[in-house]
Amino acid sequence: MEPRDKLAADLADDLPVAASSLMAMTLAPEGDRMRGDESGTDGPPRMVGQYKLPLRTWSVPVLAILGLAVVIFVLAFWLNVLTGDSDGTTSADNLVHALLYQDVDQARNTLGGLGEVMAAVLGLALTVSSIIVQLAATRFTPHITSLFFRARTNLLVLGFFVTATVFVVWVNFSIGDNYVPRWGVLFSMLLMTASLLLLFPYFAYVFDFLDPEKIVGRITANGLYACTPIRGKAAQAVDERQLQAIEAVEHLTNIGLNALQQKDKNIASSAIEALCKFAVLYGETKAGMLKEWHRIAPWNRRSPDFVSLSHEAVGDLRERCTWLEWKILRQYQMVFTEGLTQIKDVCYLIAIDTRRLGEAAAKRGDLHTLDLSIKFFNTYLRATINANDIRTAYNILHQYRQLGEMVVNEGRSMVRKARSKSEREQREVLERAKTLERRAVDVARFMRYYSSVAFKRGMVFIAEVIAHDIGTLCAVAFHAESRCHDEILRIFLAVDDATESADKEKTLRGVRLAQIKLATDYLVHGSVALAKQVADDMKAEDHKRLRSMWQELDKLDTREFWEVNDRGSNFDYLTPEQKTALAHFFAWFPGLGYEQVEDDPSVVLRP
């Protein structure tokens, strides 16, 4: 588990909110953090969304308006002094006396006007804030209302307006023929002045409070605080903390869904990113949670995300300590399904964040969460194939392959770092690395399965994309000297089995091109036996077809693809070294020498 102070220090980089609101978004109480006292986790998981504007936002308009009013008042008084009578009635002493010693009629006139102004200020503040909050709640999530009226600053300002109004009413009511509340009149004047001065900063606070990114950040921080390991009696309130975390996840999802319906891509992206940050930060600290935290309570079991699961599936989530990750990924699945018909860019972002969630789990050794990420990637692929959405499937495969690459590299990194350790520790690390790298094999195996599904549904391009992605993953495993390479290669060479045409004689051209590309990579790095293994798999191919593919690969000189896409490069691009190895590879096919390659006008070359 990461130290609490490190989490607090890194929070600014992990939560998608403005810097002004990050001050309140920590995983420990404010006072304890200032003292550096580790006992701060003994307290209850209180809400940390006490949003505050910078002091300058309040002080600058207040001082500016007050200063201007004072200058005008002093100027008017000075002009009165200059143009007043010579009897000396216009003086500072007389001004002070007039303010402090009013008679009954003067006090009643003053308080009558003050009462009306104070009521107007209070009504204006309540009306404006209520309308704005209601509009924001309709646009984002109803939870905004509770956040707003729970904010300390909002309660203080509205409470001040109400108190000032009540005070003015009481002072006005207390005036009688024999009693003049001179100081009450003066305080009423001061309270009205303060209320008017606070009005504009308060409106600025309300608008800033309802900024979408800050709302998302505040909800995220509140949910994260409920997931933070604590000690003492507060740690036993597991149900309350689970409810707080679940509500945060669901509120973020509602924001994303509402934004999708309104075609607001930026807000939807912020909510999706926040869910990813939530899952990653929670994963870093969940090892310190009580065992009771990982159970699924009956009230939680009845929620839509768990109610349809079998008892065995719920038991697996409990034993693997992944119920909250399941909850978050289920929200991703729901937003993904909505995004397929609304804003497809959101689907790409969900794939990216699912990859990030899986990568974070792999780095900390949480294989169960990594398996969940892989499972949901498969679910995304199934949804896109069922919807015949080629472009979305293309982009999801890109992220899926990158997750597999990261798993391979992380496994090799673990082995390298263990070289300086004892023999026993090295064996343990090797076993963990082997278990981790098995997930890369799973990724390749699942990809091959979905290539068959896509091919049967007529999505030929997706089948070819999967072949290139598995080939790239195989190359990464080869360069990393991973023990899972041979198994990934076996899966890669079996991709063509699922993409043969109906007469079982013709394999997809893109699959063969991907295999040739991998073989040239082997040859460039001296692995002739592996390249020969690829050639043996292609020995039944028609020579004319092989010659056409040789020509296509040899004449493709541009790495960058000519259209805008996430990958940005041509699948079939070969480096100059790989092109040199083409002759070596095709020499294994009798009768197919380099001198026999001729220009074939039927081949469509890429730029």
Predicted regions and their residues:
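Hydrophobic alpha-helical transmembrane segments
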Residues: L63-L66, V157, F187
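Eukaryotic, compositionally biased intrinsically disordered regions
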Residues: E595-P607
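Canonical alpha-helical transmembrane segment with a positive-inside/aromatic-interface signature
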Residues: L147, A151, N172-A245
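Transmembrane alpha-helix detector for multi-pass membrane proteins
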Residues: I72-S86, Y101-I175, S195-F207
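Soluble C-terminal extramembrane regulatory/interaction domains of multi-pass membrane proteins
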Residues: F207-Q596
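Hydrophobic alpha-helical transmembrane segments and immediately flanking/interface helices
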Residues: I131-H143, L147, N178-L198, I255-L281
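Membrane-anchoring hydrophobic segments
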Residues: E2-P3, A8-A119
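Secondary-structure capping and boundary motifs in well-ordered enzyme cores
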Residues: V117, N154, L191-S195, V346, ...
